[in-house]
Amino acid sequence: MLAPKKQKFRKAHKGRVASKAKAGTTLAFGSFGLKSIDGWRVTARQIEAGRKAATRCMKRQGRLWIRIFPDVPVSQKPAEVRMGKGKGSPEFFAVRVSPGRIMFEIEGVEENVALRALELASAKLPVRTRIVRRYE
């Protein structure tokens, strides 16, 4: 799973995904991409599940790029613990995905295979997505 090697701070603010993405909104590597329609927090496990689903569909042909990286530590308190007494320990990493952000890109496979792979990957993600092509 994806995680930063080193962090400046152990814990982060909850934050919000407010505005549209300013960078990473166009295809940079592949011919087909998966673009987010709404903003949400995507965890490292969800990214990995999407990657596995897409590469299985592609039968390990072609190339897949992941354009997002989970760099925000998300902390949680244990179950059935009373309020207060601190924030809780970091449990996993996530990325705040803004609307319009390209998350996955595919190159080197036929169009129908690429579209099917991106559909399978989008089913693993909590954000609504659309598939974009290079020539759109």
From Swiss-Prot:
Pfam families: Ribosomal_L16. GO terms for molecular function: rRNA binding; structural constituent of ribosome; tRNA binding. SUPFAM superfamilies: Ribosomal protein L16p/L10e. Keywords: Ribonucleoprotein, Ribosomal protein, RNA-binding, rRNA-binding, tRNA-binding. One of its GO terms (biological process) is translation. One of its GO terms (cellular component) is cytosolic large ribosomal subunit. InterPro entries: Ribosomal_uL16, Ribosomal_uL16_bact-type, Ribosomal_uL16_CS, Ribosomal_uL16_dom, Ribosomal_uL16_sf. Belongs to the universal ribosomal protein uL16 family. Part of the 50S ribosomal subunit. Binds 23S rRNA and is also seen to make contacts with the A and possibly P site tRNAs. This is Large ribosomal subunit protein uL16. The lineage of its organism: Bacteria, Pseudomonadati, Pseudomonadota, Alphaproteobacteria, Rickettsiales. The gene is rplP.
